[in-house]
């Protein structure tokens, strides 16, 4: 059996919506320029400058880990291009964000930054950023999240067999691994010359790390083509089921602090660092919950039955049961819940909150065999009979859910990165970092002037 994998993304991309700490205010407001043309959209120089300042603010006190300004600008611009492409694709797929949803998101951002929406406006003004621009940025990032969610729901699935295999593997190793990586990207269908250039660059990066001239995190920020380069290439904690099979065996044999590679993967050359490891089973105590077995009878309220009529009907049904009528037989005859009526109102075993707080409170308050007084929920009027209760260990169930989630996340990361490469390859992108918005000339993005840098990766094609 294959189940769809769904993912909820909880944070906005820092590249465009980070508010705290706020970067220093602009000293002047020059005529805006076009940094890049992206199909029928553009990235303005003001957007690029603001995004670069946001990245620098996140590295306050660690500026030496950032690449030269021209390299950083190119990395950030490429991210903004990808945001524009995703927003455009989402719009074509009918993904929208209402003003009400946007207002709630901004209120949440303000709260996370310890201020109000008005206070947020003031901070943005001090940063030289208009509130309308900020709203547009947040809207774009929510849209990108929803595009990822839609992608996950339509293309990512995890089978029970995959979960079983991962659980067996996890039981055999019992370890989780904190990883970081550096990706030297190669275009799809790379030529021999491009592969050789990529190999030369990754060898150069590895040499810098081995000599101690750069630590791994700084090298990732400076040279990696991965979307998480500006986070030092940090991949977080992974179990073996989240790691591509080609790398899993290698990681098993590594010690914390070791760097492996270069390794050739589908996206290019990789360097992989094992930051630390831990026992995945530590703290894995049982989690016990109370489950209840119950039956119910529902009388709905609608066009053909008023509130008063429904209440009178449920009162009559309860009186019959209290008078000796069998609950199951009465449910088959009178319940308006089509899902459970055929089973005599039987709901099986469930935790108290499975059918909402009102229903749960009624079940919890009963003794086994007792029948509740009529009570109202959004569905209508109910009576419920508690059949039994038990303590259940749900740790195994939770573990399966967690493993399914981690496998799904790994698949989503791999597939969505390929999807982004496809979007980027199909798009018309022209870099115009030196031109005013009303000029027609174009200019390629600046290359690194760092004399110690290995050769840059092959340029991504533009049309």
From Swiss-Prot:
Question: Where is the protein localized?
Answer: Periplasm
Where is each PpiC domain found?
Answer: 174-276, 289-388
Q: Where is the stretch described as Disordered?
A: 328-348, 432-463
Listed GO biological process terms? Gram-negative-bacterium-type cell outer membrane assembly; protein folding; protein stabilization
Signal peptide residue numbers: 1-25
Q: What is an example of a GO molecular function annotated in this UniProt entry?
A: unfolded protein binding
Its UniProt entry gives the catalysed reaction(s) as: [protein]-peptidylproline (omega=180) = [protein]-peptidylproline (omega=0)
Q: Where is the composition biased (Pro residues)?
A: 453-463
Keywords, A to Z, come to: Chaperone, Isomerase, Periplasm, Repeat, Rotamase, Signal
EC numbers on record: 5.2.1.8
What does the entry list under GO cellular component? outer membrane-bounded periplasmic space
- Enzyme class, top EC level, equals isomerase
UniProt entry tagged with the keyword Isomerase: yes
Q: Spans of biased composition, class Low complexity? A: 440-452
> What is the stated purpose of this protein?
Chaperone involved in the correct folding and assembly of outer membrane proteins. Recognizes specific patterns of aromatic residues and the orientation of their side chains, which are found more frequently in integral outer membrane proteins. May act in both early periplasmic and late outer membrane-associated steps of protein maturation.
What's in the domain note?
The PPIase activity resides only in the second parvulin domain. The N-terminal region and the C-terminal tail are necessary and sufficient for the chaperone activity of SurA. The PPIase activity is dispensable for SurA to function as a chaperone. The N-terminal region and the C-terminal tail are also required for porin recognition.
Q: What name goes with this protein?
A: Chaperone SurA
The species is: Xanthomonas euvesicatoria pv. vesicatoria (strain 85-10) (Xanthomonas campestris pv. vesicatoria)
Which gene holds the coding sequence for this protein?
surA
């Amino acid at each position: 059996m294959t189940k769809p994998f769904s993912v909820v993304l909880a944070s906005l991309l820092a590249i465009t919506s980070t508010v705290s700490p706020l970067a220093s205010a602009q000293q002047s407001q020059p005529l805006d320029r076009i940094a890049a043309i992206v199909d029928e959209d553009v990235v303005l120089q003001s957007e690029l400058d603001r995004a670069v300042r946001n990245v620098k603010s996140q590295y306050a006190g660690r500026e030496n880990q950032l690449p030269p300004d021209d390299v950083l600008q190119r990395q950030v611009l490429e991210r903004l291009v990808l945001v524009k492409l995703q927003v455009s694709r989402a719009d074509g797929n009918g993904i929208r964000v209402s003003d009400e949803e946007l207002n709630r998101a901004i209120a949440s951002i303000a709260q996370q930054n310890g201020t109000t929406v008005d206070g947020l406006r003031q901070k943005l003004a001090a940063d030289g950023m208009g509130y309308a621009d900020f709203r547009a940025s947040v809207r774009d990032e929510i849209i990108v999240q929803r595009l990822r969610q839609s992608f996950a729901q339509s293309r990512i699935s995890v089978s029970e067999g995959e979960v079983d295999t991962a659980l067996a593997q996890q039981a055999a190793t019992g370890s989780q691994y904190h990883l970081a990586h550096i990706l030297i990207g190669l275009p799809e269908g790379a030529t021999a010359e491009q592969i050789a250039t990529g190999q030369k660059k990754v060898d150069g990066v590895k040499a810098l790390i081995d000599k101690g001239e750069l630590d791994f995190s700084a090298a990732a920020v400076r040279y990696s083509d991965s979307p998480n380069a500006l986070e030092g290439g940090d991949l977080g904690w992974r179990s073996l089921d989240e790691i591509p099979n080609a790398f899993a065996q290698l990681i098993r044999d590594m010690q914390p602090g070791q760097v492996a590679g270069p390794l050739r993967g589908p996206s290019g050359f990789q360097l992989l660092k094992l930051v630390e490891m831990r026992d995945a089973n530590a703290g894995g105590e049982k989690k016990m919950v109370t489950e209840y077995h119950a039956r119910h009878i529902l009388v709905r309220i609608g066009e053909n039955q008023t509130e008063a009529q429904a209440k009178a009907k449920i009162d009559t049904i309860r009186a019959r049961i209290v008078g000796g009528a069998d609950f199951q037989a009465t449910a088959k005859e009178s319940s308006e819940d089509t899902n459970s009526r055929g089973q005599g109102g039987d709901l099986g075993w469930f935790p108290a909150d499975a059918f909402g707080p009102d229903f749960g409170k009624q079940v919890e308050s009963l003794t086994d065999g007792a029948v509740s007084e009529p009570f109202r929920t959004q569905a209508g009027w109910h009576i419920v009979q508690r059949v039994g209760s038990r303590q259940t260990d749900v740790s195994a169930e939770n573990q399966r859910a967690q493993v399914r989630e981690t496998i799904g996340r790994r698949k989503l990361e791999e597939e969505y990165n390929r999807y982004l490469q496809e979007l980027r390859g199909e798009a018309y992108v022209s870099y115009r970092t030196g031109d005013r918005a009303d000029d027609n000339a174009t200019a390629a993005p600046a290359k690194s002037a760092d004399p110690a840098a290995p050769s840059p990766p092959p340029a991504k094609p533009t049309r």
